[in-house]
């Protein structure tokens, strides 16, 4: 069974509580459980991991080397600051999609730059929790196509 890893970065554990007018009312657990059910129904294994620090996320990316087929990542604020996260993703050579709940381009200027976007298969932003569904759909189609 092909494996997809869902990674969520800093502060995403606060979904449903933190600024719901920006990030929505669903909790991270709601999103993870929903995606896991969708993946399972389509014959895929979905694992998930969230951390508020850079090191645990990088370690989890390294652990995925040669045993994960696709990564869906919402790096949170690390999007705009972490060269190390970019290097970790490049080092394992696993295709990935970058997801953001809010439209980062409609927010503060410091949120407009991503260290990941140019090496991602795609970027989904501004569509709320539904963006994760679209990322999962893309991951499955990508894996089915054998690219």
UniProtKB/Swiss-Prot annotation:
Q: Which residues form the active site?
A: 23, 100
GO terms (BP aspect): amino acid biosynthetic process; aromatic amino acid family biosynthetic process; chorismate biosynthetic process; quinate catabolic process
SUPFAM superfamilies per UniProt = Type II 3-dehydroquinate dehydratase
Associated pathway: Metabolic intermediate biosynthesis; chorismate biosynthesis; chorismate from D-erythrose 4-phosphate and phosphoenolpyruvate: step 3/7
Q: So where does substrate get bound?
A: 74, 80, 87, 101-102, 111
Q: Which UniProt keywords apply?
A: Amino-acid biosynthesis, Aromatic amino acid biosynthesis, Lyase
One Gene Ontology MF term:
3-dehydroquinate dehydratase activity
Name of the top EC class for this enzyme:
lyase
E.C. number: 4.2.1.10
* Self-association and partners: Homododecamer.
Q: What does this protein do?
A: Catalyzes a trans-dehydration via an enolate intermediate.
By sequence similarity, the record places it as follows: Belongs to the type-II 3-dehydroquinase family.
Q: What is this protein identified as?
A: 3-dehydroquinate dehydratase
């Amino acid at each position: 069974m092909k494996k997809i890893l869902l990674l969520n970065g800093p502060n995403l554990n606060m979904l449903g509580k933190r600024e719901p007018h920006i990030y929505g009312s669903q909790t991270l657990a709601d999103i993870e459980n929903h995606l896991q059910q969708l993946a399972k129904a389509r014959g895929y294994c979905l694992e998930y991991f969230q951390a508020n620090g850079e090191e645990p996320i990088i370690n989890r990316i390294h652990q995925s080397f040669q045993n994960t087929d696709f990564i869906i990542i919402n790096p949170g604020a690390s999007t705009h600051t972490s060269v190390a996260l970019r290097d970790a993703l490049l080092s394992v050579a696993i295709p990935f999609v970058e997801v953001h709940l809010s439209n980062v381009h409609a927010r503060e200027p410091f949120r407009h730059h991503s260290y990941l976007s140019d090496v991602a298969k795609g970027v989904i932003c501004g569509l709320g929790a539904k963006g994760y569904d679209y990322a999962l759909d893309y991951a499955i189609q990508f894996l089915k196509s054998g690219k």
